[in-house]
Regions:
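Alpha-helical transmembrane segments and, especially, the helix-loop junctions at the ends
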Residues: 38, 78-95, 100, 105-152, ...
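Long, contiguous bundles of hydrophobic transmembrane helices that form the permeation core
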Residues: 1-2, 156-271
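Juxtamembrane/transmembrane-helix interface segments of polytopic membrane transporters
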Residues: 133-137, 177, 226, 289, ...
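Membrane-interface helix termini and inter-helical loops of multi-pass transporters
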Residues: 17-18, 137-152, 228-236, 295-311
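Membrane-embedded alpha-helical segments and adjacent helix-loop junctions characteristic
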Residues: 6-101, 262-316
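Hydrophobic alpha-helical transmembrane segments and immediately flanking/interface helices
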Residues: 94-111, 227-241, 305-316
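Interfacial loop-to-helix junctions that mark the boundaries of transmembrane helices
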Residues: 2-8, 18-29, 151-160, 206-207, ...
């Protein structure tokens, strides 16, 4: 924080030292977790596990013919897929390529299909989300939430708000899209869209099952440990980064068994570190935000705002 800042001894160097200090602070806490998650996501894409998960989850939608029933289902499915594909832009591209033609073929209007896809990846309660990791790390610095982990934050606090909110949003989507289509006079029978099938995943049922689970394995581990510790009182310290690294090792073993090519499989683990590099812009955003806050504190603006808010609540 700004109160802990130690000057370099040269005034014009201090702003750069603040940036450097924030990088060190972020990369050794929330930033490291985000990089690990980015690496795991990158490896899941490399071995095709994300593709299997999308295929398994998206295929059943093609059998539902009612366009408005598909609206809340697609919204909730998109949020579920955000566990596997944390990038909102990448998720939107995948949904547009796979689900959008299915929705149009089922008779959903163009704007309704676009709207439901655009609003996915909103507030999914997952300890794998970079936003939740960052918030948990900041809360853990306070006395009230000292030692708070991302899992505790999500499963004890976030989920109480986000799950009901997601259900309300799904229901609101159903009525709102129906109302807007009726008002706009959309032609719901217009299905002149080539149905782009979700890419078929070849392999045995065991392969599809295991590889569909792999992208979700870290959160499954965290949920199981949280349930055990909550019900039995057992002390098991499974952090997000530990769950991700353990899942990474399990994924490598699965790849070794599937391909029977040790050299190629181990060479493919490079995608994990490339994924970490791909997550670096998220860490840079956290650093930029931290530097901005330090700047506000240095000019006393944060203190003045706190005093003003205290005065308002006192007079109220």
């Amino acid at each position: 924080s700004f109160t802990d800042f130690v000057s370099s001894g040269v005034t014009w160097l201090d702003p750069f030292k603040v940036v450097g200090d924030q990088f060190v602070s972020t990369l050794t806490s929330a930033g490291f977790i985000i990089l690990i998650l980015g690496g795991y996501t990158g490896y899941m894409s490399h071995i095709g596990a994300n593709e299997v998960t999308v295929s398994v989850l998206a295929k059943p939608i093609a059998h539902i013919k009612s366009p408005y029933i598909l609206v809340p289902i697609t919204f909730l499915l998109g949020n579920l897929l955000s566990l596997v594909i944390p990038s909102a832009s990448n998720l939107a591209i995948i949904l547009m390529a796979t689900l959008y033609p299915v929705l149009r073929q089922a008779g959903m209007s163009l704007l309704s299909a676009a709207a439901v896809i655009a609003t996915t990846a909103t507030i999914m309660p997952t300890p794998l989300g970079s936003d939740n990791v960052a918030i948990a790390a900041e809360l853990a610095k306070t006395d009230m939430f000292s030692g708070l982990t991302a899992s505790d934050y999500v499963f004890r606090y976030h989920v109480l708000v986000s799950i009901p909110t997601l259900l309300v949003m799904a229901l609101a989507h159903y009525f709102w899209q129906k109302f807007m289509d009726k008002r706009a006079g959309s032609d719901l029978t217009d299905g002149d869209v080539d149905l782009a099938e979700v890419k078929a995943v070849e392999g045995s049922a065991l392969y599809r099952t295991v590889y569909a689970i792999l992208p979700l394995l870290p959160i499954i581990m965290l949920l199981i440990v949280f349930a055990i510790t909550s019900t039995t009182g057992a002390k098991i310290d499974l952090s997000v980064e530990l769950a991700s690294i353990l899942s990474f090792v399990i994924a490598i073993i699965c790849e070794l068994i599937r391909t029977r090519k040790g050299k190629e499989t181990l060479a493919g683990t490079e995608s994990f570190f490339k994924g970490m590099g791909g997550a670096m812009p998220i860490v840079a955003l956290l650093v930029a935000a931290s530097v901005f806050v330090v700047g506000l504190k240095s000019i006393g603006l944060i203190t003045e705002l706190q005093n003003a808010m205290t005065g308002l609540s006192g007079s109220g």
